[in-house]
Swiss-Prot record:
Crosslink site: Glycyl lysine isopeptide (Lys-Gly) (interchain with G-Cter in SUMO2): 294
UniProt main location, coarse: nucleus
Protein name: Basic helix-loop-helix ARNT-like protein 2
Tissue-by-tissue expression: Expressed in fetal brain. Highly expressed in brain and placenta. Lower levels in heart, liver, thymus, kidney and lung. Located to endothelial cells and neuronal cells of the suprachiasmatic nucleus (SCN). Also detected in endothelial cells of the heart, lung and kidney. In the brain, specifically expressed in the thalamus, hippocampus and amygdala.
Claim: DNA-binding is one of the keywords in the record: yes
Any GO BP annotation: circadian rhythm
InterPro entries noted in UniProt: bHLH_dom, Circadian_TF, HLH_DNA-bd_sf, Nuc_translocat, PAS, PAS-like_dom_sf, PAS_fold
Keywords: Activator, Biological rhythms, DNA-binding, Isopeptide bond, Nucleus, Repeat, Transcription, Transcription regulation, Ubl conjugation
Domain of life: Eukaryota
NCBIfam families, sorted: sensory_box
Pfam family, one: PAS
Record has Ubl conjugation as a keyword: yes
PROSITE patterns: BHLH (PS50888), PAS (PS50112)
Length: 636
């Protein structure tokens, strides 16, 4: 009984405390709600740690938390409620701070977005102003993107890069010159006439007085007239094309960045700047003033000779310019058409194009036919231009190694040998007269040559002679099939020189002419040695032997190439015996060093050296006697 009474008393006390605490808890937790009964409070306390939807907490754990709360409330309700109030106030304070931070961030973002918007608007306004300043952007029907506008601006600046302020603005003349003086100087320098023509109808707005010197027109008779009335009918379309002002701006291909297509513009110039695409230069034929021609006797009254109108070829150069209509005095015509666009016209200078009269001879002026050859000091070809094949018929390899004198006509040898000696002794260019050169087909072509020598700058030795050969038209001569006597020479020279017809060799050239160049080279070299050396030992035995045994090629070329006479053979035999006797007693070779050197030079004389050896063998071995060829089985 006592226990039951104590439990009842404890429950009573607990109920009283709960009744006292319930209003406080209800006021703290939900200030807008009124205090409820004990049952509602207990149910509220039991439902406080209810599991939230979607949480992973265990229901048993939530029950344990509820029991702990009840236990704390039963032990010290006031302390627990005060601690709970502090936690609630702290959480509410943190929530307030988070809200203030969010408000500040939102305000900052709004300010930043407003700044960016103002920047974009300012950039768009600048792009629009830039597009309004660029002539290529004005006539566009649709709005261009920013990248296209910037590209057009760059192209426009590039087109103006080559222009100077003196040609763009109004200050195009020096301050000390007046407009009339400057115009007079321009017309005097250009030797033409200045004119201004409207681009729409071709109306002549202005023409200078100097037009009377070229076209025989008065200044007043042309002003206000149409230029197309004075043009040749075949030139009207061309001049209209030049007067068209659709391409007054620079001709650039513009690509839209969005679509990737080319931007086509129909430009109407509204500024006075001179663009690179506005320059005009063309030729046209303009009528001159009527010239009365006197009627000749026997001519019909309606003859075309009564009135003669002549066309002159005029070279027109200038620029297309645009002005407001009120400046050029065209406002009335513009008002009648209700057109407020600028007036475009051509400002140009016309110059008379000279007419070249063709030659009466009928010959056409063409570039002269030339080819280049190089030959050594002795006249042998070392280089032949490929163009020589079309003129001479020889391949370059056919001429290499041969002497140029083998192809020169014999009548030109004297002149060419003098030129050959001159070019070896001089560093200047030597011009030859016209001479005949034998072609491959046997005919002779006439050439003129310019010779000059080339000296090696390191060795200081003359290496070769350069010959620039020019073909002289209309002077080719066919080869002669029969023998022609050399009438220019004396009877004595003609009797000594053998003019034989050799198969495969055209007449007009000399047999053995290949040695002429070598003789000239040796002569010039000897002359240079004599001039360079101050002393020459001619009295030494070696010099005597050299003088005795040296073969003179020049004398051989002029002598008759036949067996010597018996007296000459005797002298030659005696000389040979004396030479052998001297060689035996002196124990020296038959030929001295000088003779051996001259023997080498003799071998370079080609045909002359071979003829000399044949004469010597005929004299020594009896090869010149007729032989018995009866035993030979073939016919000769």
């Amino acid at each position: 009984m006592a226990a039951e009474e104590e439990a009842a008393a404890g429950g009573k006390v607990l109920r009283e405390e709960n009744q006292c605490i319930a209003p406080v808890v209800s006021s703290r937790v939900s200030p807008g709600t009124r205090p409820t009964a004990m049952g509602s409070f207990s149910s509220h306390m039991t439902e406080f740690p209810r599991k939230r939807k979607g949480s992973d907490s265990d229901p048993s754990q939530s029950g344990i938390m509820t029991e702990k709360v009840v236990e704390k409330l039963s032990q010290n309700p006031l302390t627990y409620l005060l601690s709970t109030r502090i936690e609630i106030s702290a959480s509410s304070g943190s929530r307030v701070e988070d809200g203030e931070h969010q408000v500040k961030m939102k305000a900052f973002r709004e300010a930043h977005s407003q700044t960016e918007k103002r920047r974009r608007d300012k950039m768009n306004n600048l792009i629009e102003e830039l597009s309004a300043m660029i002539p290529q952007c004005n006539p566009m029907a649709r709005k261009l993107d920013k990248l296209t506008v910037l590209r057009m601006a760059v192209q426009h600046l590039r087109s103006l890069k080559g222009l100077t302020n003196s040609y763009v603005g109004s200050n195009y003349r020096p301050s000390f010159l007046q407009d009339n003086e400057l115009r007079h100087l321009i017309l005097k320098t250009a030797e033409g006439f200045l004119f201004v023509v409207g681009c729409e109808r071709g109306k002549i707005l202005f023409v200078s007085k100097s037009v009377s010197k070229i076209l025989n027109y008065d200044q007043a008779s042309l002003t206000g007239q149409s230029l197309f009335d004075f043009l040749h009918p075949k030139d009207v379309a061309k001049v209209k094309e030049q007067l068209s002002s659709f391409d007054i701006s620079p001709r650039e291909k513009l690509i839209d960045a969005k679509t990737g297509l080319q931007v086509h513009s129909n430009l109407h110039a509204g500024r006075t700047r001179v663009y690179s695409g506005s320059r005009r230069s063309f030729f046209c034929r303009i009528k001159s003033c009527k010239i009365s021609v006197k009627e000749e006797h026997g001519c019909l009254p309606n003859s075309k000779k009564k009135e003669h109108r002549k066309f002159y070829t005029i070279h027109c150069t200038g620029y297309l310019r645009s002005w407001p209509p009120n400046i050029v005095g065209m406002e009335e015509e513009r008002n009648s058409k209700k057109d407020n666009s600028n007036f475009t016209c051509l400002v140009a200078i016309g110059r008379l194009q000279p007419y070249i009269v063709p030659q009466n001879s009928g010959e056409i002026n063409v570039k002269p036919t030339e080819f280049i050859t190089r030959f050594a000091v002795n006249g042998k070809f070392v280089y032949v231009d490929q163009r020589a094949t079309a003129i001479l018929g020889y391949l370059p390899q056919e001429l290499l190694g041969t002497s140029c004198y083998e192809y020169f006509h014999q009548d030109d040898h004297n002149n060419l040998t003098d030129k050959h000696k001159a070019v070896l002794q001089s560093k200047e260019k030597i011009l030859t007269d016209s001479y005949k050169f034998r072609a491959k087909d046997g005919s002779f072509v006439t050439l003129k040559s310019q010779w000059f020598s080339f000296t090696n700058p390191w060795t200081k030795e003359l290496e070769y002679i350069v010959s620039v050969n020019t073909l002289v038209l209309g002077h080719s001569e066919p080869g002669e099939a029969s023998f022609l006597p050399c009438s220019s020479q004396s009877s004595e020279e003609s009797s000594r020189q053998s003019c034989m017809s050799v198969p495969g060799m055209s007449t007009g050239t000399v047999l053995g002419a290949g040695s002429i160049g070598t003789d000239i080279a040796n002569e010039i070299l000897d002359l240079q040695r004599l001039q360079s050396s101050s002393y020459l030992d001619d009295s030494s035995p070696t010099g005597l032997m050299k003088d005795t045994h040296t073969v003179n090629c020049r004398s051989m070329s002029n002598k008759e190439l036949f067996p010597p006479s018996p007296s000459e053979m005797g002298e030659l035999e005696a000389t040979r015996q004396n030479q052998s006797t001297v060689a035996v007693h002196s124990h020296e070779p038959l030929l001295s060093d000088g003779a051996q050197l001259d023997f080498d030079a003799l071998c370079d004389n080609d045909d002359t050296a071979m003829a000399a050896f044949m004469n010597y063998l005929e004299a020594e071995g009896g090869l010149g006697d007729p032989g018995d060829f009866s035993d030979i089985q073939w016919t000769l």
